[in-house]
Swiss-Prot record:
S-adenosyl-L-methionine-dependent methyltransferase that catalyzes four methylations of the modified target histidine residue in translation elongation factor 2 (EF-2), to form an intermediate called diphthine methyl ester. The four successive methylation reactions represent the second step of diphthamide biosynthesis. One of its GO terms (biological process) is methylation. The gene is dph5. It is an enzyme of class 2 (transferase). Belongs to the diphthine synthase family. S-adenosyl-L-methionine binds at L9, D84, G87, S112, I113, L163, M221, H246. It is found in: Cytoplasm. Its EC number is 2.1.1.314. SUPFAM superfamilies: Tetrapyrrole methylase. One of its GO terms (molecular function) is diphthine methyl ester synthase activity. This is Diphthine methyl ester synthase. NCBIfam families: dph5.
Length: 283
């Protein structure tokens, strides 16, 4: 059997009881280590499980799926995933490949940012499509995220923005020269995300990601020191919410007054928050 097991949001203790029982019976255990990160070292997992955990980077997951699935028709193999197992298309690819090899698959779910974001007080059923925001480079500044946010804005819906993670990435030069030299890990901050959104707004001028757009930023969700920030996009661009991981929400115009009341507790500037929130309620 091939198992995809969600680890939850923070540390080794967030795995479900069912997930832990399953891991302990597996002969081989991989930790998917590039679509998200756990906020503890893998040694903590190994200590809890009493088993070796193999780090599976992008290259292994995308290019060596048959190696991961090897013998899973005769023994139990697990892929551990931060958050929920189906939070990335890569994991769907693994399931499809396992099916092609006639290997049975089972998923064990867990909390992810997709549902934990409700901790900020915004109602989950009022969210539109989730978007991803990548690091802007000199010659690479994609704006497709802006168009997706625009669609959500037109419907009055909130937008969850997932921020870029660079783990075991190569520079363009090293990639072109075929050198397996990797850059240090980078995790996009909420403030940088806000800055990039404002840059695109300045270019597009469509009033989608304006300095006065209400937003929420969350950091280290599920941890003991998680932080929730509420304010304008301009305020977020100037505010540091600490170590990773971060996510951002742009508040939709169809926001309910109870949602705004909940958010007030996290406002970085209450007077300014109330001023901007009033314009949302006057829609």
């Amino acid at each position: 059997m091939f198992y995809l097991i969600g680890l939850g949001l923070f540390d080794e203790k967030d795995i479900t009881l069912r997930g832990l029982e399953t891991v302990k019976k597996c002969q081989r255990i991989y930790l998917e280590a590039y679509t998200s990160i756990l906020l503890v070292q893998k040694e903590k997992l190994e200590e809890l499980y009493g088993k070796e955990v193999i780090l599976a980077d992008r290259e292994m997951v995308e290019s060596s799926s048959d190696e991961i699935l090897k013998d899973a028709d005769n023994c139990d193999v697990a892929m551990l995933v931060v958050g929920d197992p189906m939070g990335a298309t890569t994991h769907a690819d693994l399931v499809i490949r396992a099916r092609e090899l006639k290997i049975p698959v089972r998923m064990i779910h867990n909390a992810s940012i997709m549902n934990a974001i409700g901790a900020c007080g915004l109602q989950l059923y009022k969210f539109g499509q989730t978007v991803s925001l990548v690091f802007f480079e000199n010659n690479y500044r994609p704006q497709s995220f802006y168009d997706h946010i625009k669609e959500n804005v037109s419907l009055g819906l909130h937008t969850l923005v997932l921020l870029d993670i660079k783990v075991k990435e190569q520079s363009w030069e090293n990639l072109a020269r075929g050198r397996k030299v990797y850059e240090p890990p980078r995790y996009m901050s909420a403030s940088l995300a806000a800055q990039q959104m404002l840059e695109v707004e300045e270019d597009r001028q469509e009033n989608i990601c304006t300095p006065d757009s209400l937003c929420v930023a969350v950091g280290r969700m599920g941890s003991d020191d998680q932080v929730i920030f509420a304010g304008t996009l301009q305020e977020l661009a100037e505010h540091d919410i600490g170590p990773p991981l971060h996510s951002v929400v742009l508040v939709g115009r169809d926001v309910h007054d109870l949602e705004l009341e909940f958010l007030r507790a996290y406002a970085v500037n209450l007077e300014n928050f109330d001023r901007v929130a009033k314009t949302y309620l006057e829609k």
